Design a protein with these regions (language model features):
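Active-site groove signature of glycoside hydrolases
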Residues: 105-124
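Beta/alpha (TIM)-barrel catalytic core signal, keyed to glycine-rich beta->alpha loops juxtaposed to Asp/Glu
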Residues: 121-384
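Short, acidic/polar
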Residues: 23-38, 90-109, 155-165
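Acidic (Asp/Glu)-rich catalytic clusters
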Residues: 2-6, 61-77, 105-110, 138-140, ...
Length: 385
């Protein structure tokens, strides 16, 4: 939806249709989910070949007559990835990148992809990542890819790959995607990432996993065929569970899941400028997930008129945001020492180089913004909920 003037408040993450998060994704009513998502104004889809079999399932759904009779290809955006194949298998070679893009085009039955990301760039060398970006830029010049991106968790690596790519090709990386770095538990995308990305020409950031990969919700992390893959240590899990229980008792119409979603959406919107956009990607695998996420978003956004379409909700509802400050403050206080905990085990750093646990983080208890890398069981790291 390149014609949309405002960045999407919510992007549908396709990892919900993967074996990592669902033992039987083929059984999901994906056509119904996509139809309802499009009706509600969730028109951008993010996935990856790594989220097997998400691309195949969504490609088949998008070719269904019920969707094709109502929506043109230009009515929605498709974002996918290249380079990551399995949990411990990557292929960033130019030949494979080209094959992967061609395969995604075939699976989606389209002649172009809106965004293609190099997937989890921190797991390969800087040279491999930069070379892969160059291959995607070739596709961009041919009109096959509209925007070129890189994705991963590590902000330092993302910023360095973007810098090196711009230096080598005299063309910026258009888009960055990072996961679990703009949440109630971790705001390092804001405190350490956005300024660095802007400085090297990035104009759009997608922050996925607003629930910290399923951590910030009642019931704990989701389990797929890969079992308990979550990188959070037990202390953080316990703090999140305590916060979820407190929200169930005292959160009123909100639970920890909806509050975390709203916090991420508000943070994203507050960091948007006319030349730099931030959006939230959330995993969706059921109609209930979709409806609840859209309702949560609308509670902190406002539209010019009475509309069901989330695309019309382009501004923050300042009164609603203000009313949630105390809840956000309480949850972040309960997370305590685990604020900005890095899932890779690295100590988070502020811009002045100090450990984030050695200083009081700006906005540590406020929703308002100021104007070993090989993870165990990482099959779902970057699989986003």
């Amino acid at each position: 939806m390149s014609s949309t003037s405002s960045p999407p408040a919510l992007v549908m993450g396709g990892a919900g249709f993967s074996y990592q998060l669902n033992p039987n994704p083929e059984s999901l009513p994906i056509v119904d989910i996509l139809l309802r998502a499009f009706e509600l104004g969730v028109r951008t889809i993010d996935t990856s070949p790594y989220y097997e079999p998400s691309e195949q399932l969504m490609g088949a759904a998008l070719s269904d007559p019920r969707i094709q009779s109502r929506y043109r290809r230009s009515d929605y955006e498709l974002m996918t990835k290249v380079g990551r194949i399995k949990e411990n298998e990557f292929n960033y070679s130019p030949d494979w990148i080209r094959k992967s893009v061609a395969r995604s085009l075939e699976r989606f039955g389209t002649t172009y992809l809106d965004v293609v990301f190099c997937h989890d760039v921190e797991y390969v060398s800087l040279d491999e990542a930069v070379t892969a970006v160059g291959v995607l830029l070739d596709f961009q010049r041919a009109g096959v890819i509209l925007r070129v991106g890189i994705s991963g968790y590590d902000i330092d690596t993302l910023a360095e790959v973007a810098r090196l790519a711009r230096e080598k090709y005299d063309h910026p990386v258009d888009v960055v995607q990072t996961w679990a770095q703009l949440t109630l538990q971790n705001t390092q995308a804001e405190t350490r990432g956005f300024d660095r990305f802007r400085a090297v020409g990035v104009n759009s950031v997608f922050c996925s996993s607003p629930l910290a990969v399923g951590l910030l919700r009642t019931g704990g992390i989701p389990l797929g065929l890969t079992g308990d893959w979550h990188p959070a240590p037990q202390g953080l899990r316990a703090a999140a569970a305590e916060a979820a229980e407190w929200m169930d008792k005292h959160g009123g119409e909100e639970n920890l899941c909806s509050l975390a979603m709203q916090y991420a959406i508000v943070k994203a919107k507050q960091n948007c400028t006319p030349s730099f956009s931030v959006s939230t990607i959330t995993g969706i695998s059921t109609l209930s997930d979709l409806e609840q996420n859209v309702v949560a978003a609308k509670r902190v956004l406002k539209a010019a008129g009475d509309s069901e379409n989330l695309l019309d909700y382009t501004e923050l509802d300042s009164q609603s945001v203000e009313s949630r400050l105390a809840l956000c403050e309480r949850v972040r206080l309960m997370l305590g020492e685990w604020l900005d905990y890095d899932f890779t085990g690295k100590k988070p750093k502020t811009l002045d180089g100090k450990s984030a646990r050695e200083v009081k983080m700006p906005g540590a208890v406020s929703i308002a913004a100021a104007d070993d890398r090989d993870l165990k069981q990482s099959a779902a790291v970057g699989v986003l909920v």
